[in-house]
Amino acid sequence: EMPEYDYCYCDLCRERFKAQTGRDPMDSLYPMEDQSWINYRLDGITRVVEKIAARVKGDGKFLSGAVFPGPSMARRMVRQDWGNWPLDAYFPMIYNGFYYEGPEWIGRSVAESVKAVNGRAAIYAGLMFPDITGDDFEKALDEAYDNGASGVSFFDGPDDEYLVRLKAYLDRRGFVPAN
């Protein structure tokens, strides 16, 4: 975590944090390791999501979000505590190739995500199509569905050949497509 580049260390956030705790996070040698500052950041983003959710759901609408993969990774990487957000569905961006992982990582990330939402929302595994071509395509789908995903979404693809493969896969598994 680099204050100058990756996360907000603006004057307003620092002042509000100081009002709560009596200290400026930048006074710490390693602010990125200060649990109070981390919690402040997690809570700040969660409050924004809660306000949006109240408005959207107050209008009777369904609310979903594309989030970073796996709640623990999202908390660490981008301060998204999305496992505690009041959404109806989550699309964790489980781009296994981006993280130099195989299709098995998709299953682990889905399992963690499903556990975090504990039945109160659907998990749709967000898959990066170029990462799951060839034999990895069905392996990735198995990993997602076998670990509790309600479905999958594709980022950057798939092409017509893989759409045919997807339909055949869903038919074999007995899944009924949503309208």
Q: Where is each model-derived feature located?
A:
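Short, composition-biased local secondary-structure segments
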Residues: 23-25, 111-114
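Substrate-binding cleft of secreted/luminal carbohydrate-active enzymes
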Residues: 87-105, 109-113, 119-179
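Polysaccharide-binding and catalytic clefts of secreted carbohydrate-active enzymes
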Residues: 1-87, 93-100
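Residues that form generic nucleotide/phosphate-binding pockets
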Residues: 16, 20, 116, 169
